[in-house]
Amino acid sequence: LQQETTKSRYEFICRGLVQYQEEFPFYFKMVLDKINIEFENNNYLPEEKETYHIGEEINEKIKQFLLSGMEKGDLRSDLELMPAIFNFWGMLSGIIQLAANKEDYIRKSMGLSKNQFMEYGFSLVYDSIAVRRTE
């Protein structure tokens, strides 16, 4: 088993979210919307429960990434886990959704491809939680 770096785990999460948005744009948007989280009664759509579980899986992957990175000393140790997870998810998905919705504008006004724009955004987010190394 190869040793994963914190940065490569992060890139894997970003790629997974991009792939999810490209393959299932409707569900990707749905994960970001307000959905029913009460599944005790039968007053919900099957898609809501599925979307909830996908969201929970994404939260868990981000949580493991943050915990591992903090443990290794790659990520800031002052991160509050649950708020960080939710903010992280919001920032990454916002970058992805914005790139999908505004691809033509990004190309025309910035001269960047959709992927270049997302990579830049992803690196800004990562740098905000990474430990600053002084050389």
Predicted regions and their residues:
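Conserved acidic
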Residues: 2, 6-9, 50, 54, ...
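Short beta-strand "wing" residues that participate in macromolecule-binding interfaces
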Residues: 77
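Hydrophobic alpha-helical transmembrane segments
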Residues: 2-3, 31, 62-66
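Hydrophobic alpha-helical connector segments
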Residues: 1-27, 81, 85-88
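Short secondary-structure transition hinges
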Residues: 18-61, 74, 83-85, 111
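Alpha-helix C-capping/helix-to-loop hinge sites
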Residues: 3, 72-73
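Secondary-structure edge/capping motif, primarily at the C-terminal ends of alpha-helices
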Residues: 1-3, 35-42, 99-103
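C-terminal peripheral helix-coil segments that are non-catalytic and often amphipathic
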Residues: 19, 56, 60, 64-72, ...
